[in-house]
């Protein structure tokens, strides 16, 4: 078993943070899986464990460079973006590895008991996720439920140059509400749990006066969910600056995909060629449904959004109006010139 290879994907760790579980996968598994959790394709059949000391030995022998990260809010084409950047053998993309969600949950539990996530555990997890095949650049797109880990991932030791860089991807509140209405069943299943986790990770409720979450309807919960994440993104941008953070709106990505992909390629140092990115946009991943794998052109996406907006216009406008006092109290900084937060 060669744990220096990404063929042994980090799958988890025990409560002590000293035993790590690995699942045997292939390069194809990474390329075709929209999620590296229970939805991984195909499901791994072989698992092995290693101690923290063994992991340290593996990482000492690895020469992988720091990964680039895509942190995102919900329903903002992050999966589509990740597939557009997936170019074997130049890049290796990890989409929503379960172990980072597990690390965030572990961090949440420690924080509730006035503890802190051990730096060594975080270093081991990130080091194992950043293993690569040959000279591939690694891109990691965590689930947004792990966004509280962003400061720890980006932080740099005193006196050391900045290491990790990230893209912060989100969308306008208006477009989030449209997406929620397109995927109501999925949203109802995920949103309460995700929102509760995000609020635990943040001092948001100390800044914002809200009625009980149970009294809010789905769109109001969605608006709070969006604002809580954008509140965090404001903080991340202020703390780490343009050297480590590239802000990007879904609106700009969909409107100017080649320009957006080129900016990410340059910022993360992925080494992708202009022709590769052009092909991605004109006949590749950009024209496919990121999760279904079927053809899904931008025009179809736009038409569906317009249909939802026409059908639920009153509900959307009501939610935007309800959120206005909160936005005045804690403004959200647009990610780029394409993002109009309320339209």
PLM-predicted stretches and their roles:
Residues 99-113, 147-244, 249-274:
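PAPS-dependent sulfotransferase catalytic domain
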Residues 1-60, 208-219, 230-247, 254-343:
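PAPS-dependent sulfotransferases, especially Golgi type II membrane carbohydrate sulfotransferases
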Residues 1-127:
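PAPS-dependent sulfotransferase catalytic core
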Residues 132-152:
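Glycine-rich phosphate-binding loop used to anchor ATP phosphates in small-molecule kinases
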Residues 124-133, 231-237:
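CE4/NodB-like, metal-dependent polysaccharide N-deacetylase domain
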